[in-house]
Amino acid sequence: MLHIYHGDGKGKTTAALGLVMRELGHAQKVLVVQFLKDGKSGEISFLKQQPLVTCLYSPMPKLFYYQMGQEMRVTTALSQHALFETAEQTAAQYACILLDEALDALQLGILQEIEMLAFLNANKAREIILTGRNPSKNILACGDYITCLLYTSDAADEEDS
């Protein structure tokens, strides 16, 4: 089953981690791959302590992708794509695979839609979770459960006023 959490609202990763928790509650092995994140979140710190979870991420510069120079973008894209390749190679070991921010990696051209569609097709027996913004029509067409989280307000907006 393919779960897609997308949109400009907060909570996509949090919702995805709820599915991860459900799988862990059923003693299932889970792979969590974080694209464009450095793995330093509290959630990843917790998940790394769980014996049934494998977490993959790559060090990230303290810049958004669009702020990086060409050389840094190439290096970052290669390291992020290597995460996807590892997920492809090890997918059979897991009941559930979270590809966090994969939709953003697709939008930025770090991952190619054709390879993602092949991955999704090859892993229909698994719970696959994609998060991020702006999924393509082809990706959405593969989804079994699709949730769009919309931005309405943020406490930080109040603080900035």
Model-derived segments and spans:
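Phosphate-binding/switch loop-helix module in NTP-utilizing enzymes
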Residues: 69-120
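Short, polar loop motifs at secondary-structure junctions
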Residues: 132-136
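Conserved small/polar residues in nucleotide/adenosyl-binding loops
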Residues: 151-156
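Short loop/helix-cap segments at secondary-structure boundaries that form the rim of catalytic
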Residues: 48, 137-142
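Loop/turn-to-beta-strand initiation segments
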Residues: 94-96, 124-129
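Conserved P-loop
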Residues: 2-86
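A short helix-turn-beta junction within AAA+ P-loop NTPase domains corresponding to the substrate/partner-engaging
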Residues: 142-150
